[in-house]
Regions:
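Glycine/proline-rich active-site loop of Rossmann-fold NAD(P)-dependent oxidoreductases
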Residues: 143, 169-182, 192, 207-208, ...
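Mid/C-terminal beta-alpha module of Rossmann-like enzyme folds, strongest
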Residues: 184, 213-216, 220-259
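Conserved Rossmann-fold NAD(P)-dependent oxidoreductase catalytic core, especially the SDR/UDP-sugar
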Residues: 76, 98-137
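Conserved C-terminal active-site "lid" loop/helix of NAD(P)H-dependent oxidoreductases
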Residues: 238, 257-289, 293
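NAD(P)H-binding glycine-rich loop region in Rossmannoid oxidoreductase-like domains
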Residues: 55-94
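N-terminal Rossmann NAD(P)H-binding glycine-rich loop of SDR-like oxidoreductase domains
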Residues: 4-24
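A conserved pocket-lining segment of Rossmann-fold NAD(P)-dependent short-chain dehydrogenase/reductase
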Residues: 160-171, 183-205
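Conserved beta-loop-beta element that borders a ligand/cofactor-binding pocket
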Residues: 120, 146-172
């Protein structure tokens, strides 16, 4: 049985990835600053007892180095989200940039040759659909990590894939600047009022599309320092809410606020460049699954 270490693995995305990877007969270890178990237990049930946990700080290099020893695969999902990076940019850089360097350096010293990490659609600004031009601290830190990944490939032949998802939604996505559409699904099902705090068009990605890509990338482990745009289905927040109301007509959900500081859609570098049969989950299906979870 091969070993996989997931930094930041007890959060929303990490919990879903763990659920997905359990069927691959991998020994999973989760490294996180604060271990969160509620969603993970909900998703995987009794298999929770087969997961190992390390409570540690990604900014502590010795702890990261020790955790990566004897691992076959590494995923780095750890990082502060957009609001935290904006309110404390120094801490955001410490965690998102220095923490990522620690992971790259640790896998280099432990002779591991492939890493999957989360970048973000936030590396784009609000005009250019092809070229990254971040307009938030979070996006700037993520773009810096992509450059660091290229340096580690050029200098040490460590291959990596940086996943650039747009707005991920799905059961359990309740933290972060774009969690509002998932919280709207929860509000609709539980019959309370909720206002999504942004407007405009953006790409919506159902969480299991990301977990599917992680599964396949572990098997393929492409060579190079690759970035993968995961745009999802581009639509307006207004339309997203209309689909919620198609499921629950009396839902008390609405939206307000400015559009996000990113383009409506990112083009090029999508998953089909590596997996030509890849297709995104429809909004109708993804929203229905999210509502029914609650």
């Amino acid at each position: 049985m091969k070993n996989i270490l997931i930094f930041g693995g007890s959060g929303f995305l990490g919990s879903w990835i763990t659920k997905s990877l359990l069927k691959k007969n991998l020994k999973i270890t989760i490294f996180d600053l604060r271990i969160k178990t509620e969603l993970l237990k909900n998703l995987i049930g009794d298999e929770f007892n087969n997961i190992d946990f390390i409570e540690g700080d990604i900014t502590d290099f010795e702890g990261v180095l020790k955790a990566t020893k004897d691992m076959d695969y590494i995923l780095n999902l750890a990082g502060l989200m957009t609001p935290d990076c904006s309110s404390n940019p120094s801490l955001g850089a410490e965690v998102n940039v220095k923490g990522s360097i620690n992971v790259f350096e640790a896998i280099k010293r432990n002779n591991i040759k492939f890493l999957i990490y989360t970048s973000s659609g936030g590396v784009y600004g609000n005009e250019d659909k092809y070229n990254p031009f971040p307009e938030t601290h979070y996006g700037a830190f993520k773009l810096a990590v992509e450059g660091i990944a290229r340096a580690y490939f050029n200098e040490s032949l460590i291959s990596s894939v940086g996943l650039r998802p747009f707005v991920i939604y799905g059961p359990g996505r309740e933290v972060g600047g774009t969690a509002g559409v998932t919280l709207a699904c929860k509000a609709a099902k539980q019959n309370f009022e909720y206002t999504v705090g942004f407007s405009g068009k953006v790409g919506f990605v159902y969480v299991e599309d990301v977990t599917n890509l992680v599964e396949r990338l572990i098997d393929k482990a492409p060579l190079g320092a690759i970035t993968m745009n995961i745009n999802g289905i581009t639509t307006s927040v207004e339309n997203f809410i209309s689909i919620i109301k198609k499921n629950i007509p009396d839902a008390k959900v609405k939206f307000s606020g400015k559009p996000l500081s990113v383009v409506e859609e990112i083009l090029g570098g999508d998953p089909s460049k590596i997996f030509n049969d890849f297709k995104y989950t429809s909004l109708d299906y993804g929203i229905n699954k999210t509502i029914n979870f609650y």
